[in-house]
From Swiss-Prot:
One GO biological process term: glycogen biosynthetic process
Keywords, in A-Z order: Allosteric enzyme, ATP-binding, Carbohydrate metabolism, Glycogen biosynthesis, Glycogen metabolism, Nucleotide-binding, Nucleotidyltransferase, Transferase
Entries under Pfam families matching the protein: Hexapep_GlmU, NTP_transferase
Record's protein name: Glucose-1-phosphate adenylyltransferase
NCBIfam families: glgC (TIGR02091), PRK00725.1 (NF001947), PRK00844.1 (NF002023)
Gene Ontology terms for molecular function: ATP binding; glucose-1-phosphate adenylyltransferase activity
Binding site for beta-D-fructose 1,6-bisphosphate: K39, Q429, E430, R431
Entry annotated with the keyword Lipid metabolism: no
Enzyme class: transferase
Regulation: Allosterically activated by fructose-1,6-bisphosphate (F16BP) and inhibited by AMP.
The enzyme's E.C. designation: 2.7.7.27
Length: 431
């Protein structure tokens, strides 16, 4: 776990988060997750057996000492808003603590959607100014990671930066999906290009590029000035990565913060964990990794808990069916309210209230809340969306052509099943 260095003033570590406000950009649709995000924004997608993706950014804020948070919403925000209202309403108004929901206001140009990530903040500037923060922490609400933002704040102040960008090396073949930077010996950013077709390699490792994680810290007054200027620029795309960060880089005011310095992990020798889970395969793989014997992401660390909305559910139950078959599981996450009757579940993640009936075999599957699996089903390498009713005898994940005809099948062979897909096949979704 991250610890302050001995020469770091403890008072600074305590005061900087109090002087900060975090703004979580949570309006993204996440189109690469296909039908998983038709009715919910990507930050509201379920993850890890009981959480939503946005819980990680919110928990990082709380654990870092930042208790003034704005969540900027847009696409299909109802599920996200409901989750935050139910699970994140424990703040003390008397202590000036809050999670403020900031939907698209159409204040500036009367458009239906935010024009870019920077415009999402600009449209809410009148509200954000009232927070009277000295520092603004800009976060994406759709990434899985654990980070101590107070350590990044200290780095920001000690370097005398006006803007600090969290960064980490990524394989050069994947770098086109990120903002890529070059830094000098003092970690000042000397070049920044958003999603380049030919990403430059790191001088120390030709196989990797230094990528922005979309995590920024700004001096508040400086940020407001930049956003107002950007808003007047008709040629701008009003995006942090495309417009704001390159401009600050040209002015020599942007610094990089290596993610390993503030990444929170139980094993100090492990690789820093950060996942985008932006594709179906990445989402499926990140969920299943949590069910492994030693997952890369430790969610059992009591020093850095991941919080969420907690439902009052009975414990999971594994029962013997009438034929004598035992319900059993191996290397899996099984949440509260689940019942497994006379079936085998291996290397899978079952969210709350999943019911698996007799003679089923569930292998390498992610079953979202309220899924009901009929008798004698075989489910493999799949993601089953919330409240799906899988009919008796259905087989998923064994025949590529059949899977692609009935459902969505990714190039990597991961199958996504939704209620609408099952209805089109004539299967009733009420039980």
């Amino acid at each position: 776990m991250v610890r302050l260095e001995k020469n770091d003033p403890l008072m600074l570590a305590r005061q900087l988060p109090i002087k900060s406000v975090a703004l979580i950009l949570a309006g993204g649709r996440g189109t690469r997750l296909k039908d998983l995000t038709i009715k919910r924004a990507k930050p509201a997608v379920h993850f890890g057996g009981k959480f939503r993706i946005i819980d990680f950014a919110l928990s990082n804020c709380i654990n870092s000492g930042i208790r003034r948070i704005g969540v900027i919403t847009q696409y299909q925000s109802h599920t996200l808003v409901q989750h935050i209202q139910r699970g994140w309403s424990f703040f003390s108004e008397e202590m000036n603590e809050f999670v403020d929901l900031l939907p698209a206001q159409q204040r500036v140009h009367g458009e239906n959607w935010y024009r870019g990530t920077a415009d999402a903040v600009t449209q809410n500037l009148d509200i954000i100014r009232r927070y009277k923060a000295e520092y603004v922490v800009i976060l994406a609400g759709d990434h899985i990671y654990k980070q101590d933002y107070s350590r990044m704040l200290i780095d920001h102040v000690e370097k005398g930066a006006r803007c600090t960008v969290a960064c980490m090396p990524v394989p050069i073949e994947e770098a086109s999906a990120f903002g890529v930077m070059a830094v000098d010996e003092n970690e000042k950013i000397i070049e920044f290009v958003e999603k380049p077709a030919n990403p430059p390699a790191m001088p120390t490792d030709p196989t990797k590029s230094l990528a922005s994680m979309g995590i920024y810290i700004f001096d508040a007054a400086y940020l407001y000035e930049l956003l107002e200027e950007d808003d007047r620029n008709e040629n701008s795309s009003h995006d942090f990565g495309k417009d704001i960060i390159p401009k600050i880089t040209e002015a020599g005011m942007a610094y990089a913060h290596p993610f390993p310095l503030s990444c929170v992990q139980s094993d100090p020798n492990a690789e820093p964990y950060w996942r985008d889970v932006g594709t179906l395969e990445a989402y499926w793989k990140a969920n299943l990794d949590l069910a492994s014997v030693t997952p890369e992401l430790d969610m059992y660390d009591q020093n850095w808990p991941i919080r969420t909305h907690m439902e009052s559910l009975p414990p999971a139950k594994f029962v013997q069916d009438r034929s004598g078959s035992h319900g059993m599981t191996l290397n899996s996450l099984v949440s509260g309210g689940c019942i497994i009757s006379g079936s085998v579940v291996v290397q899978s993640v079952l969210f709350p209230r999943v019911r698996v009936n007799s003679f089923c075999n569930i292998d390498s599957a992610v079953l979202l809340p309220d899924v009901w699996v009929g008798r004698s089903c075989r489910l493999r390498r799949c993601v089953i969306d919330r409240a799906c009713v899988i009919p008796e005898g259905m087989v998923i994940g064994e025949n590529a052509e059949e899977d692609a005809r009935r459902f969505y099948r990714s190039e990597e062979g991961i199958v996504l099943v939704t209620r609408d897909m099952l209805r089109k096949l004539g299967h009733k979704q009420e039980r």
